[in-house]
């Protein structure tokens, strides 16, 4: 599974708009939209930030697992 449907699902589960999430991540709305639609590759540092925000593993965001587990350090 590609990562970008996961981004949308996580955002929608938290009842956030793209604009709200982009503001929380300190990026442009259109930039985040491009990540969420797969038009732009998600940088690793931002993937970490998103995983921390949602408290999920990078494996979940990347689609390597369907098990939502908290991020571990």
Q: Model regions: which residues?
A:
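Short alpha-helical DNA-recognition segment
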Residues: 15-34
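Residues in the recognition helix of alpha-helical DNA-binding motifs
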Residues: 10, 24, 35, 64
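DNA major-groove recognition helix of helix-turn-helix/homeodomain DNA-binding modules
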Residues: 26, 45-60
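Base-recognition residues in the alpha-helical recognition helix of bacterial helix-turn-helix
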Residues: 30-34, 45, 63
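A short, Lys/Arg-rich alpha-helix, primarily the initiator
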Residues: 1-13
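Short, charged recognition helix plus adjacent turn
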Residues: 13, 52, 62-73
């Amino acid at each position: 599974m590609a990562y970008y449907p996961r981004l949308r699902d996580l955002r929608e589960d938290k009842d956030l708009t793209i604009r709200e999430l982009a503001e929380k991540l300190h990026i442009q709305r259109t930039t985040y939209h491009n990540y969420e639609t797969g038009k732009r590759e998600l940088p690793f540092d931002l993937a970490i930030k998103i995983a921390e925000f949602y408290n999920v593993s990078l494996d979940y965001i990347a689609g390597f697992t369907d098990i939502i587990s908290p991020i571990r350090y």
